[in-house]
Amino acid sequence: MPRTMIPPGECTYAGRKRRRPLQKQRPAVGAEKSNPSKRHRDRLNAELDHLASLLPFPPDIISKLDKLSVLRLSVSYLRVKSFFQVVQEQSSRQPAAGAPSPGDSCPLAGSAVLEGRLLLESLNGFALVVSAEGTIFYASATIVDYLGFHQTDVMHQNIYDYIHVDDRQDFCRQLHWAMDPPQVVFGQPPPLETGDDAILGRLLRAQEWGTGTPTEYSAFLTRCFICRVRCLLDSTSGFLTMQFQGKLKFLFGQKKKAPSGAMLPPRLSLFCIAAPVLLPSAAEMKMRSALLRAKPRADTAATADAKVKATTSLCESELHGKPNYSAGRSSRESGVLVLREQTDAGRWAQVPARAPCLCLRGGPDLVLDPKGGSGDREEEQHRMLSRASGVTGRRETPGPTKPLPWTAGKHSEDGARPRLQPSKNDPPSLRPMPRGSCLPCPCVQGTFRNSPISHPPSPSPSAYSSRTSRPMRDVGEDQVHPPLCHFPQRSLQHQLPQPGAQRFATRGYPMEDMKLQGVPMPPGDLCGPTLLLDVSIKMEKDSGCEGAADGCVPSQVWLGASDRSHPATFPTRMHLKTEPDSRQQVYISHLGHGVRGAQPHGRATAGRSRELTPFHPAHCACLEPTDGLPQSEPPHQLCARGRGEQSCTCRAAEAAPVVKREPLDSPQWATHSQGMVPGMLPKSALATLVPPQASGCTFLP
C-alpha cells in the first residue's frame, strides 16, 4: 500500500536515524511454488543493494540504511555531482582568470582528497549548503561531532526539521537575498519574482563568468546569524545554539523546471559554516585576572590548572612531577610567587600568582602580593643580577674566611644564647645600624643604580605592637627585632624603599609580613642559603663540655644577633641537632642573598673584636654557636653534601660537631614557663626556594 508522506511544513523535529529492518530467514522448501511478486521484490532488493554499494560511504554505514534512505542519498549524490560538473566547466572556460600552471591544473587525486578531508576536520564546525527551498544540499561528515546526526541522516532532508520552531522564520529570511521572502503556500508553485529578475540575472552572469560579485550587492549576500539546532548530544534542552556564517551563491546544475516545462535559472543558496556558540562560564570570563591556582610548597610538586598550562604552552607530561622550585620563585619577603616556565618559542613566560593571605592551621599558608606583577624581564633581570655586588655595580671578590668574635650574652633557664660582638674595623656595610633600619646587603646595593650607602630607616617594631594578638612580655628595651633586607622591584632605582609592614596573629605570636614587591628570582640563580619551613633546629652541647657557659644547654638555634631573634625552620619535617665539642669554634656564615640578621646594638658586649669578613658559600645554613667557647683558629669545614650526596662528608681530624636527624616531634618554641615569647619570622621571608639538585654544600663549621 502507498505510504503517506508528512508535508515538510507539518514535520516534527528530527529524531534518530532509521535502522534497516532485520530480514526474516525462512527455511527453504524444495517443493515451494514460484511467486511472481516475490521475484519482483528480489530483483528490486538486488538493484537497491547494488545502488547502495555505489554510495561513497563505508560498508558499515551502508548496511544500516533502509530502502528510502538509499534512494534519498542517491538523489543527493547525483545533485552534488551535477553541481561540481558545472563548476568545473565554468572554470575551464576562464583560463585567463587564474592562469594556472600545467602542474597545478592536474593535481594528484590522492592528495586532493586528503587535503579536503583535513580541511573539513580542521574547522571548528561543519560545512553546510542549504538550497532556496530549505533542503540540505550538502553537510560535511563532521556534523556528527556537533549535532549527533550522521551525514546520511541529514543529506537531502528538510532543514526546518532541525531548526527550533521559534527560529524557523528567521532562517527562512536568511535564504532570500533581500531577507524578504515571498509567502509560499504549501502545494502551490512559488510566485514569479518579476522585480528581482534583473538583479538576479546580473548576479548570475557575474558569477558564471567569474568577474566576481558586484560591490553594490556584496553586502546583501553575506550572512552571519544564530539559530538553535536540534542536537542529540545535548540532554538538557535538546538544542544547540550555532552560528551560521557564509554567503549566498548560485547553486548550478540542478536543472529544475517550471510547471510549464520551462527551465528555471539557478537560485541563490546558502553556503556556510555552522559552528557552535560557546557561552563561557563565569570562571572562564575572568581568565586574565585568575591565571594561577597553586599551593606552593618547597618539597612538593607544583600544581597548576589548565589556564597556566595554556599560558606556558606546556602539556601535562611536562608539568607532572616537576618540583615547585623549577616552576616558581618566591621573591623573599614580598611573597609574590611567579610561575616561570619555558614556552614553545624558547622564551620564558612569567605568570604572577595573585591571591590574598590564606591562614590555614593557625598560620599563613600562602601570602601573596595582590599588586605584584611580572612580565618577560629575562634580559633586564640578567643585567640587574650582574651588578649584585658593590654600590658602583662592579663585582667584588669575596675576601678570605676569618673567624667571627663571639661573646657570652645573657643566659636564661632554657639555654645560652650567643651574641656577636661587632668590631670598630668592620666594613661600613656590616656596622650596626640604627634601631629599626635595614642593613645594606651587598646583593641589594649592586642591584639598583646609584644606590646610596645610607638607607631610610624602617618603622620601629613598636609601631605595630597594637596589631598583635598577644602583648610582648619580658622584652628589654634594648631588644629589637632584626630588620629584614628586601629586594625591591626594578621601578625603585635610586634607594631602598621604606617597607610597609603587616602583622598577622598566628598561634598567639606576633609576626610580620613585609608587603613589598620583589624581583622574581630566575631558576638558574642560586644566590643564597636555604631557609625553608616546618623543621626545628636545636643545638645541644656535649655532656662533657667544659667551655660551656654556666653548663646550660640552649634549647634552639636563633638566626640573627639579638635576643629577640627568629627561629629557623626547614621543610623536611626532621629535627637537626648539632653537638659542638668544647675544642671547636663555631663560626657564623654570611647570608649572601638570604635574610641577614641585624648586628647587636644597645647592649654591653665583652671579648675581643675581630674584623668581620664575610664569605660566600654556594648554599649555607648559618647557625649561631653557643657562648663561652674559646676563640681559636677556624678548623676545617664540615661539608655535608646536599640531596643525592648525603654519604659524602669531609671531616677534619679534630672535628667534633655531629649532625643527627630525628623524627618529627616539634618542641614548643615558647611555653608559659619561658621568660619571653620569641617573634617568629614570617614564612614568606624564610621560604627561599633553591633547587635541591644544585651542586652545593651545607657548611657547618
From Swiss-Prot:
The UniProt record lists the PAS domain at 112-182
Keywords from the named record: Cytoplasm, DNA-binding, Isopeptide bond, Nucleus, Transcription, Transcription regulation, Ubl conjugation
Cellular component aspect of the GO annotation: aryl hydrocarbon receptor complex; chromatin; cytoplasm; nucleoplasm; nucleus
Q: What induces it?
A: By 3-methylcholanthrene (3-MC) in MNCs from adults. By the heterodimer AHR/ARNT.
Start and end residues of each stretch annotated as Needed for transcriptional repression: 551-701
SUPFAM superfamilies xref list? HLH, helix-loop-helix DNA-binding domain, PYP-like sensor domain (PAS domain)
**Cystine residue pairs:** none
Domain of life of the native organism: Eukaryota
Q: Does the UniProt entry include the keyword Transmembrane?
A: no
Quaternary structure annotation from Swiss-Prot or TrEMBL: Interacts with ANKRA2, HDAC4 and HDAC5. Interacts with ARNT; forms a heterodimer with ARNT.
Query: What is the name of the protein in this document?
Result: Aryl hydrocarbon receptor repressor
Origin species, per record, is: Homo sapiens
